A protein has these predicted regions:
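Bacterial N-terminal signal peptides that target proteins for export
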Residues: 1-11
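Sec/Tat signal peptide C-region and signal peptidase I cleavage site
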Residues: 18-24
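Extracellular/periplasmic juxtamembrane helices and adjacent flexible linkers that interface
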Residues: 253-333
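Short beta-strand->loop
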Residues: 32-34, 125-127, 145-171, 185-189, ...
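Short helix-loop capping/hinge motifs at secondary-structure junctions, enriched
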Residues: 128-134, 153, 166-174, 252-260
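A bilobed periplasmic-binding-protein/Venus flytrap-type ligand-binding module shared by bacterial periplasmic
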Residues: 121-129, 243-260, 277-281
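N-terminal segment of the mature folded domain
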Residues: 25-154, 331
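Ligand-binding pocket segment of bilobal, Venus flytrap-like solute-binding proteins
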Residues: 171-237
Length: 333
């Protein structure tokens, strides 16, 4: 039954919104999030709602919207009334801020640049790893099909792309060689889904591909739900430190009078319980004590940052993912 519920969530296309309770609440928030956080926020919202009622005496309902991070950001810009956004990468929230919906220094509002947990990119392979995939180099081999979403719509896909580029740059020593390496990976990609969850469906349910480039939490969730007899996780020795951020949407929360609740909601991530929830859902917690408790859950991977290798998200977005950027050039060819 658990598996069927997971599959049901997997097969929902596009942005999904649901309420935590059928009863009218004193406060209602809309959290616009990225694709593979659905299960995470089921647990987080339940815990926060209980804590909020205990603290304030008021009931709160959290509605969720999920989809590719870039698409979700555009939905907020186009009028989706998000009280908070919890997206895959800072650039997508910057895009919302640049339209005046929240202050441009929003990352200074909460600790760790408003990223309460981290993740990385790993490989999900079929049981027994029949293609012997162990590192990024294996993704360019003839006969290996790689599943990854479209970086024009998916934040996870951009992390996948940049992780591969960072590996290529370190191993081969030049931007030109890194470009060729990443281009060769995309020659092995048969389909680009719009979001990370869609790519999981393609790989897990439809049986397409030999390896899924995945958020670490998404890979763990697939193994948990479908079994170690079906899939296994390969953590490459080198990958990227992914820092999914969170922010209150000032214009919406002020208009709706929900700012206090929205701020409390995001601050709850930094409590012991919030960090425990992140870790239980296979995200790497920021809190050192919680991180130590769950240390054995996560592979030891050398992680590089987007700032160190790419000069930050603004530069990476412009160079690689803007119209006519490097991704467009290599994917066309």
């Amino acid at each position: 039954m658990v598996r069927n519920l997971f599959v049901g969530r997997l097969l929902v296309a596009g942005s999904l919104v649901w309420a935590g309770s059928a009863l009218a609440a004193d406060v209602t928030l809309l959290n616009v999030s990225y694709d593979p956080t659905r299960e995470l926020y089921v647990e987080f919202n339940k815990a926060f709602s209980a804590a909020y009622r205990k603290e304030t005496g008021k009931s709160i309902e959290i509605k969720q919207s999920h989809g590719g991070s870039g698409s979700q950001a555009r939905s907020v810009i186009d009028g989706l009334q998000a009280d908070v956004v919890t997206l895959a990468l800072a650039y997508d929230i910057d895009a919302i801020a640049n339209k005046g919906f929240l202050k441009k220094d929003w990352q200074k509002t909460l600790p760790q640049n408003s990223s309460p947990y981290t993740s990385t990119i790993v490989f999900l392979v079929r049981k027994g790893n029949p293609k012997g995939i162990k590192d990024w180099d294996d993704l360019v081999k003839s006969g290996v099909q790689v599943i990854t979403p479209n970086p024009k719509t998916s934040g996870g896909a951009r992390w996948n792309y940049l992780a591969a580029w960072g590996y290529g740059l370190k191993k081969y020593g030049s931007e030109d060689k890194a470009r060729k390496f990443v281009a060769d990976i995309y020659k092995n990609v048969p389909v680009l889904d719009t979001g990370a969850r869609g790519s999981t469906v393609t790989f897990v349910e439809r049986g397409v591909g030999d390896v899924l480039l995945a958020w670490e939490n998404e890979a763990f969730l697939a193994v948990k739900e479908f079994g170690k007899d079906k899939f296994e996780i390969v953590a490459p020795p080198l990958s990227i430190l992914a820092e999914p951020p969170v922010a209150v949407v000032d214009s919406v929360s002020d208009k709706k009078g929900t700012r206090a609740a929205a701020e409390a909601y995001l601050k709850y991530w930094y409590t012991k319980e919030g960090q425990e929830i992140a870790a239980r859902n296979f995200y790497r917690p920021r809190d050192a004590a919680v991180g130590e408790k769950y240390a054995d859950s996560f592979a030891k991977v050398e992680l590089f940052t987007i700032d160190d290798v790419f000069g930050g998200w603004t530069k990476a977005q412009k160079e690689h993912f803007a119209e006519g950027g490097v991704f467009d050039q290599i994917y066309k060819n």
